[in-house]
Amino acid sequence: MAMIEFLLAGIPLLLLVLAIVQLSLLWAGKSAVDTAAHLASRKFARVARADFRRAREIAFLEAFQVCRNRPGGSFGSAAMTSLDVTKDGERGANRADAGEALCVRLTHGVELVVPWIDRFLFALSPGKKIRLGDHYYLMMQSTRWVTVE
């Protein structure tokens, strides 16, 4: 009887611990996306007035490297990184003047890696998400407004 009680109590406790681990990894992933967006937007703001296209490339490369080198990052998840630059959050921009404010939006896929919990969180997530085979990704976004130097 004690063994059955242990199993009945142990399974939910195991699932709770796994959920806490996965949520901690998601929190770390979101923090890495926020950091990548901040660093990318700073690099973009410095170069955008002289060469807008090159500034976007430099900012994307910075975001790509930060997302790839984050804990749990990989080339696979970094490949799901996009960087959008807009004037008002909606319309695309293709040039920038000094003092102009632009919106830099970074989107990055963070993989759900904890077994059993990955499917559950993937189903519950209301945001953008992608499933590739047996891998589940939540698309984390971070937005920064920058003033072109």
Per-segment meaning from a language model:
Residues 1-65:
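Alpha-helical assembly-interface signal, strongest on the long, hydrophobic N-terminal helix that forms
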Residues 45-149:
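Short, conserved structural patches
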